[in-house]
Amino acid sequence: MVPNPCPCGRLGDGTGACACSGADVTRYAKKMSGPLADRIDMHVTVGRVALADLSAVSNEESSSEIRRRVSQARTLQTLRYERVAGVGCNAHAAGRWIDAHGGVTSEARALLQRAADGLALSARGYHRVLKVARTIADLDESGSVSAAHVAEALRYRQPTSE
């Protein structure tokens, strides 16, 4: 699901072309109900790319390097779940399984618990954050889920606003 930030889709795109009122934006945002939003693992705002940046040389991680890291993380997950019926990756694992067997450090668990209380996360939301944190740890080639992995997963959990 990729909702626009406002009815016209131009809010925060840097062009200044959005003519939506604050009430329009609020009304539009409310269309995504709590239960629906709770089922979205990651909220990421992707800004408009300037035309000049499309051909610019970048020092960012290359697509081939990202592909390699994702492939390696998927291999780790396949090995992790080889004895768990019907599960081949973190997204398909039971949240309780990851909580019990996913290498979550005590600091990470404490941070997630504080965040769950402070953000009023549902059980589903708690486990989705945990699954994303486990995936971030896999991308970092870490055997354990640290508080930093949980903190990053929590940043993706919160809907962004412009």
Label each region the model flagged:
Residues 1-162:
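Basic, amphipathic alpha-helical bundle interface domains used for macromolecular binding and assembly
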